[in-house]
From Swiss-Prot:
<dbReference type="InterPro" id="IPR048260">
    <property type="entry name" value="Cytochrome_b_C_euk/bac"/>
</dbReference>
<dbReference type="InterPro" id="IPR036150">
    <property type="entry name" value="Cyt_b/b6_C_sf"/>
</dbReference>
<comment type="similarity">
    <text>Belongs to the cytochrome b family.</text>
</comment>
<dbReference type="InterPro" id="IPR027387">
    <property type="entry name" value="Cytb/b6-like_sf"/>
</dbReference>
<feature type="binding site" description="axial binding residue">
    <location>
        <position position="83"/>
    </location>
    <ligand>
        <name>heme b b562</name>
    </ligand>
</feature>
<feature type="transmembrane region" description="Helical">
    <location>
        <begin position="113"/>
        <end position="133"/>
    </location>
</feature>
<feature type="transmembrane region" description="Helical">
    <location>
        <begin position="226"/>
        <end position="246"/>
    </location>
</feature>
<dbReference type="InterPro" id="IPR005797">
    <property type="entry name" value="Cyt_b/b6_N"/>
</dbReference>
<keyword id="KW-0408">Iron</keyword>
<dbReference type="GO" id="GO:0045275">
    <property type="term" value="C:respiratory chain complex III"/>
</dbReference>
<comment type="subunit">
    <text>The cytochrome bc1 complex contains 11 subunits: 3 respiratory subunits (MT-CYB, CYC1 and UQCRFS1), 2 core proteins (UQCRC1 and UQCRC2) and 6 low-molecular weight proteins (UQCRH/QCR6, UQCRB/QCR7, UQCRQ/QCR8, UQCR10/QCR9, UQCR11/QCR10 and a cleavage product of UQCRFS1). This cytochrome bc1 complex then forms a dimer.</text>
</comment>
<feature type="binding site">
    <location>
        <position position="201"/>
    </location>
    <ligand>
        <name>a ubiquinone</name>
    </ligand>
</feature>
<dbReference type="InterPro" id="IPR030689">
    <property type="entry name" value="Cytochrome_b"/>
</dbReference>
<feature type="transmembrane region" description="Helical">
    <location>
        <begin position="320"/>
        <end position="340"/>
    </location>
</feature>
<feature type="binding site" description="axial binding residue">
    <location>
        <position position="97"/>
    </location>
    <ligand>
        <name>heme b b566</name>
    </ligand>
</feature>
<feature type="transmembrane region" description="Helical">
    <location>
        <begin position="288"/>
        <end position="308"/>
    </location>
</feature>
<keyword id="KW-0813">Transport</keyword>
Length: 379
């Protein structure tokens, strides 16, 4: 008798995706981030669902409802801080996952890569709208500043912004619709994840060497299931340490002040995971130019596959490209730091240099390095 997991219409899909899936024998811990992102998404959906049971999306009561969750709901404080810091964990895993894709040339799987970029945009949109919901000072002013960027679009900009706001300023209508979108988007993300995996399983996983691994596959279960579970335990441990010892470490104290349209906070800034893009936005003195640079800072990922000049897929054996990659990482960390600083000398200049370097490395220096490496290897 054939095993039920190989014949049952539903279990068959699970079997081919998680159990009998042929996987490369040499994938490292950098390949754990996909499953970790799945874990983060599940944590966010579950904690978010329980928060939504007690939250009210009304300007008069939103702030109080969050306070009520933390003070009066059983383990409400735990659910709230798991959700807030779960978002940070999500983005750490996301950036590591994308970085892995760039380093090992996983972007050559075009469909998988492009769905991944759409996923990144969707997660960023969800996180932004979620940050508005507690209706603190930074929620309100963050929403005002970021939605206002759309007014830089020629001709239709102002109309578009007022349409998104549902009025002439960020108000009750805005909060209600942001809550609706924040609730629905994670389920759309979950559906996109399925498509992401569908495309990935068409080709199979890449591996650190970048060489086809068809001749050396091992079953996903038990080898990589146990490896994923170890990753889960480590991430849950780190998340719980953050939640239970310093839950407000990554938050902004201004968000503990209820939203007040008449009082602007001294430094309006987004959560840490958007600071690099915020720094790029601020480094350009022109509004439309800044918005375009902001969008391009993420959309540039879609261009990367077409700039791949190397005869090798992975950076594993390409020292010049490796150096540039780690300079890019350092540059992104610099931009993150600058995004959280006030707009004054020397931060403005550092931000501008770092922004130019970011685009230069990806668009010019990395393709050049690849060509030089090909030349050295006489290819």
């Amino acid at each position: 008798m054939t095993n039920i997991r190989k014949t049952h219409p539903l279990l068959k899909i699970v079997n081919h995706s998680l159990i009998d899936l042929p996987a490369p024998s040499n994938i490292s811990a950098w390949w754990n981030f996909g499953s970790l992102l799945g874990l983060c998404l599940m944590i966010q959906i579950l904690t978010g669902l329980f928060l939504a049971m007690h939250y009210t999306s009304d300007t008069a009561t939103a702030f109080s409802s969050v306070t009520h969750i933390c003070r009066d709901v059983n383990y409400g404080w735990l659910i709230r801080y798991l959700h807030a810091n779960g978002a940070s964990t999500f983005f750490i895993c996301l950036y590591m996952h994308v970085g892995r894709g760039i380093y090992y040339g996983s972007y050559t799987y075009l469909e998988t890569w492009n769905i991944g970029i759409i996923l990144l945009f969707a997660v960023m949109a969800t996180a932004f709208m979620g940050y508005v919901l507690p209706w603190g000072q930074m929620s309100f002013w963050g929403a005002t500043v970021i939605t206002n960027l759309l007014s830089a679009i020629p001709y239709i900009g102002t109309t578009l912004v007022e349409w998104i706001w549902g009025g002439f300023s960020v108000d009750k209508a805005t909060l209600t619709r942001f809550f609706a979108f924040h609730f629905i988007l994670p389920f759309i993300i979950a559906a996109l994840v399925m498509i992401h995996l569908l495309f990935l399983h068409e080709t199979g996983s890449n591996n650190p060497s970048g060489i086809p691994s068809d001749s050396d596959k091992i079953p996903f279960h038990p080898y990589y299931t146990i490896k994923d579970v170890l990753g889960f335990l480590m991430v849950i441990l780190l998340l719980m340490l953050l939640v239970l010892f310093s839950p407000d470490l990554l938050g902004d104290p201004d968000n503990y002040t209820p939203a007040n349209p008449l009082n602007t906070p001294p430094h309006i800034k987004p959560e840490w995971y958007f600071l690099f893009a915020y720094a790029i936005l601020r480094s350009i003195p022109n509004k439309l130019g800044g918005v375009l640079a902001l969008v391009m800072s993420i959309l540039i990922l879609a261009i990367i596959p077409f700039l791949h000049m190397s005869k090798q897929r992975s950076m594993m054996f390409r020292p010049i490209s490796q150096v540039l990659f780690w300079i890019l990482v350092a540059d992104l960390l610099t931009l993150t730091w600058i995004g959280g600083q006030p707009v004054e000398y020397p931060f403005i200049t550092i931000g501008q240099v770092a922004s130019i370097l970011y685009f230069s490395i990806i668009l010019i220096l990395m393709p050049l390095a690849s060509l030089i490496e090909n030349k050295i290897l006489k290819w």
